[in-house]
Every structure is written in structure tokens, then in C-alpha cells.
Swiss-Prot record:
InterPro entries named in the record: FHA_dom (IPR000253), SMAD_FHA_dom_sf (IPR008984), Znf_RING (IPR001841), Znf_RING/FYVE/PHD (IPR013083)
Matching SMART domains: FHA, RING
Similarity annotation: Belongs to the DMA1 family.
Residue span(s) of domain FHA: 60-116
GO molecular function: ubiquitin protein ligase activity; zinc ion binding
Pfam families: FHA, zf-RING_11
Gene: dma1
Protein known as: Probable E3 ubiquitin-protein ligase dma1
Reactions mediated catalytically: S-ubiquitinyl-[E2 ubiquitin-conjugating enzyme]-L-cysteine + [acceptor protein]-L-lysine = [E2 ubiquitin-conjugating enzyme]-L-cysteine + N(6)-ubiquitinyl-[acceptor protein]-L-lysine
């Protein structure tokens, strides 16, 4: 027996509400590698840290990896870039706001391209918001060597990077299947938002994790420039295209096995 989209999503909403009640005091921050146009960047995997509202958490320290670091402070964020100071900056949460503070680094901490303090001077805490750009240090000798590149990161707060299940996601998945297997739908083929030409079967397509699709030829320059990250032109979601497959939500597999998509055009 299959479930309707509405019934399945209702169950998912109830489950999400239950989980949110359990983790109501737990908030998160994620740093993902930011690749700007014509700029070198120190590459790193996405980093997620959690903060408990009810506990007196220590600040999340950011600094350079050294041989003395033994991983004892699991919340610390360390990079192997030599332009990052040993104790470069710290992040903390206070009064419902995330803050970044430079701890007297020599090469500087930049928030949205603005330096927080002079060299070797501790800055005041500055509030950070979702999608802010954080930079640690500055490129040395043009950044031609990887270990002498600054660290640029996009800030994502409180699970904002997670894609929630929605009727749109389900309908887009079914539409793409029908597009490949059975040709265009009765309402007409969709358009690529870059070239405004129809997206048709047998074309090379790129489908983002948010289910928005593009002609691969149209989107390829953007993918090459920002790989392995991609910011969708339509919904502005920021994706890690090299995220391990096993990190996928198990509920998606259950959804594809059990849920059916209602076809309004057939009524």
C-alpha cells in the first residue's frame, strides 16, 4: 500500500517537530570552503560544530594545526595553513547571536572582506549571520603554494544548509524520471534558467541536490569555477557536490519506496 505525498509529508513534519523538541537547546554552525572568482583558497571539508544553550560552553577556537595539537579539544577548528595563527580567532554564541572575535592574529581575520582588528590586536566580538564570508589570514607570495593560502569560509547557521522534504522535491524527482523515460510532460518541457531554451530528453543535464536542473553546457563554467561547491541560481541553496553518498537522509529512501506523487493533470 502506497502513501500519498500529503500523508507522507505530514508524518515527516510530526517527526521533525518531535526531533526539534528534543534538540531545542542544541544549535549548530557550519563552515564550508568558499571559492571566489579568480582567487586562491585553502581547501577543506565542511566543518560542523554544535552549541548547547543550557550549558556554559567554551568558545570554539580557530587556529593553525601544530604537532602539539592532540585533538583533545574536539570543538576546536584547526587548519594546516601557515598564514593562520596558532590561536587565530574564536566563535561563540551569546544572547541568541553568533559572534566571531580575532584573538590577536598577525595576518588578520576578515568578516565580509573587512578586517576586524590591526595585527596582534584582539578585536571586539562581531555578530555573524547566515551566508557571511569569513577569511582567516591573507595569501603569502600570491598564494601559489597551498600551505600559504588564506582560509575562506561561508558561514551557515542552525542547520540552514539542510534541504527539507517538500511536495516540490517529490514532483521534481518524478518529472525528471518522466522526462528521461517518457519524454516531455503534457504541460510542456521546462526551460533552463540560463539560456531559456527547453530542457529536453537526451540532453546533458545537471540536477542540483535541491532538484533544480540546468543544461550542463550552460552551468559548466560555474561548476568549474566553484567546484566542489555550487550555489543554485534559482533557490540560492549552497551545496557540497562531493558530500559522501552515505550521508544522505534515510527518510529519502523510505520516501521513494513508499510515497506516490499525485498527478493533477490526469484528473
Amino acid at each position: 500500500m502506497t502513501k500519498s505525498v500529503e500523508g507522507y509529508l505530514k508524518e515527516q513534519e510530526l517527526a521533525a517537530e518531535t526531533d526539534s523538541e528534543k534538540d531545542d537547546d542544541k544549535i549548530s554552525i557550519r563552515l564550508t570552503n568558499f571559492v571566489g572568482p579568480n582567487a586562491h583558497s585553502f581547501s577543506f571539508d565542511p566543518l560542523v560544530r554544535y552549541w548547547n544553550r543550557k550549558q556554559n560552553n567554551l568558545p570554539i577556537y580557530i587556529g593553525r594545526y601544530t604537532e602539539r595539537y592532540n585533538g583533545g579539544d574536539v570543538s576546536a577548528i584547526v587548519f594546516r595553513s601557515k598564514v593562520v595563527s596558532r590561536r587565530h580567532a574564536q566563535i561563540f554564541y551569546e544572547n541568541n547571536t553568533w559572534y566571531i572575535q580575532d584573538m590577536g592574529s598577525s595576518s588578520g581575520t576578515f568578516l565580509n572582506h573587512v578586517r576586524l582588528s590591526p595585527p596582534s590586536k584582539t578585536s571586539k566580538p562581531y555578530p555573524i549571520s547566515n551566508n557571511d564570508i569569513l577569511q582567516l589570514g591573507a595569501d603569502y607570495r600570491g598564494g601559489h603554494e597551498v600551505n600559504y593560502r588564506c582560509v575562506r569560509a561561508r558561514v551557515e547557521l542552525n542547520n540552514s544548509w539542510k534541504i527539507k522534504l517538500s511536495p516540490y522535491n517529490l514532483n521534481e524527482f518524478k518529472r525528471m524520471q518522466e522526462l528521461v523515460l517518457c519524454g516531455s510532460s503534457e504541460s510542456g518541457p521546462p526551460e533552463c534558467c540560463i539560456c531559456l531554451m527547453p530542457v529536453l530528453p537526451c540532453q546533458a543535464l545537471f540536477v542540483a541536490p535541491c532538484s533544480h536542473s540546468y543544461h550542463y553546457k550552460c552551468i559548466r563554467p560555474t561548476l568549474n569555477e566553484s567546484h566542489p561547491y555550487f550555489s543554485c541560481f534559482i533557490c540560492r541553496k549552497y551545496h557540497d557536490l562531493e558530500a559522501p553518498v552515505e550521508e544522505g537522509d534515510e527518510s529519502l529512501n523510505d520516501l521513494l519506496r513508499n510515497a506516490t506523487v499525485k498527478d493533477d493533470a490526469s484528473e
